[in-house]
Regions:
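NAD-dependent ADP-ribosyltransferases
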Residues: 1-162
């Protein structure tokens, strides 16, 4: 996979929303429950060991509550991620590949694991896919500003320059 896509709205109707300036100020996109790669690795190991990864992924896909904020949602294609949002982002996820659960000595039914390394320990990008939503990539690690572009009309520009 080369890119994942994410749409967001500006603040309206009581929802906080985020502008590209706020995403840039935050340093990029980060799950609610993982501010670092090490936290994301630990979260994945814990959810797999507890047998709750699939249930947490389902809850996140359905409700997007902070309590299930082990992930942030992206689409594996433009159509999945875009629904008339005010802002549309492209995240560089070069090197992210589907791997077998055997890298964790586990088998999580209904879930696929994606890493940009050969193990969880040497990966800096970790994501999962719940089988019911095969084009919704649930990223568990922060994605920093330099890896993010924002759509401006018909062109993509680096978020750092927006």
């Amino acid at each position: 996979m080369q890119y994942a896509y994410r749409g967001e709205d500006n603040a309206r109707a009581g929802k906080p929303g985020r502008t590209p300036a706020r995403v840039k100020a935050a340093g990029g996109f980060t799950p609610w429950l993982a501010k670092t790669v090490d936290e994301a690795r630990s979260n994945l190991v814990t959810l797999v060991a507890n047998g709750t990864l699939a249930q947490q992924a389902q809850s996140w896909c359905m409700y997007k509550n902070k309590e299930n904020g082990w992930f942030f949602s992206t689409g594996t294609d433009v159509q999945t991620a875009y629904d008339h949002y005010d802002f549309f982002y492209r995240l560089a996820i070069d090197g992210l590949n589907k791997v077998d659960w055997s890298v964790m000595k586990a088998n999580v039914k209904g879930m696929s694991l994606y890493l940009n390394g050969t193990s969880v320990d040497d990966s800096t990008l970790i994501a999962v896919v719940w089988s019911v939503r095969p084009t919704e990539l649930l990223i568990m690690t922060p994605v920093a500003t330099p890896a993010i572009d924002v759509k401006d009309g018909d062109r993509w520009i680096p978020l750092s320059e927006y």
